[in-house]
Curated annotation (Swiss-Prot):
Gene Ontology CC, one term: cytosol
PANTHER family in the cross-refs: 4-HYDROXY-TETRAHYDRODIPICOLINATE REDUCTASE 1, CHLOROPLASTIC-RELATED, DIHYDRODIPICOLINATE REDUCTASE
Record pathway: Amino-acid biosynthesis; L-lysine biosynthesis via DAP pathway; (S)-tetrahydrodipicolinate from L-aspartate: step 4/4
Protein known as: 4-hydroxy-tetrahydrodipicolinate reductase
Residues binding NADP(+): 38
């Protein structure tokens, strides 16, 4: 690829939005074409680079994708489930690819976005960090070797501002393990415990959630048997790891046909056996 990929970023003034703007500035393969914020924001017209603390980028914050329709090829969206569905619909109507890092979707919203994959290229992933996507491969191996003989728990922690729980990454961890073991996560997941719960059912996958301070993201899968336990952990120390993954996804996505893709495909991990 010789030409830069032009991207637009929604939620440009938020914590993740500003990190995405910074990542775009640092990536030689990316050109920031637009930064979108909610209508009525006091930040309209502010230079996106100045807002992100990386110096002027000559891209003013705007409140409409329509105003920026000619300025980008890939939309990068880390907003809310409701907003992401609206943004994906807009992309489908305007022939734009989209990278979605939003989490907290319900089943119907996931189905809506999946349907748009018939019209445009979409990367949708609950976590775009390279290490997390490698962790999912490791979980397949651990589940295959140990899953039927031990207790499985998933523990995740995030900052106090995160709105959904468990995190999309934690749920994906559970899905990977359950699928490897031939289980249905909707039937075997246990979300938190309280009171007299009785003896643990080995066929379940437990989830525990921490929300505190400024934790960027920590995820651990615990495979515990009598006499030993295996812990597979990923800790993110900066949102930049997610932002860099999104930029990588954008540069990959412009070369793809319409379809719904994930970061495993972006990173070439599909079909790899560890």
């Amino acid at each position: 690829m010789t030409e830069q990929v032009r991207v637009a970023i929604t939620g440009g003034s938020g914590r993740m939005g500003r990190t995405l703007i910074e990542a775009a500035k640092q990536n030689e393969l990316i050109l920031l074409g637009a930064a979108i914020e909610r209508a009525g924001s006091t930040l309209m017209g502010v230079d996106a680079g100045e807002l992100a603390g990386v110096g002027a980028m000559n891209v003013a914050i705007t409140d409409s994708l329509d105003k920026a329709v000619d300025d980008f090829d890939v939309l990068i969206d880390f907003t809310s489930p409701e907003a992401s569905v609206v943004h994906t619909d807009w992309c489908a109507r305007n022939g734009k690819a989209i990278v979605i890092g939003t989490t907290g979707f319900n089943h119907a919203q996931k189905e809506q976005i999946s349907a748009y994959g018939d019209q445009i290229p979409i990367v949708m992933a609950p976590n775009m960090a390279v290490g997390v996507n490698l962790m999912w491969k490791l979980l397949e191996v651990a589940a295959e070797v140990m899953g039927d003989y031990c207790d499985i728990e998933i523990i995740e922690g995030h900052h106090r501002y995160k709105k959904d729980a468990p995190s999309g990454t934690a749920l994906k961890m559970g899905e990977v393990i359950a699928e490897t073991l031939g289980r249905d996560l909707e039937k075997c997941a246990v979300y938190g415990r309280e009171g007299i719960t009785g003896e643990r059912d080995r066929g379940t996958i437990g989830f525990a959630t921490v929300r505190a301070g400024d934790i960027v993201g920590e995820h651990t899968a615990l495979f515990a048997d009598i006499g030993e336990r295996l812990e597979i952990t990923h800790k993110a120390s900066s949102r930049m790891t997610f932002a860099n993954g999104a930029m990588r996804a954008a540069t990959w996505l412009v070369e793809q046909d319409a379809g719904l893709y994930d970061m495993q495909q972006v990173l070439g991990l599909k079909g790899i056996t560890i």
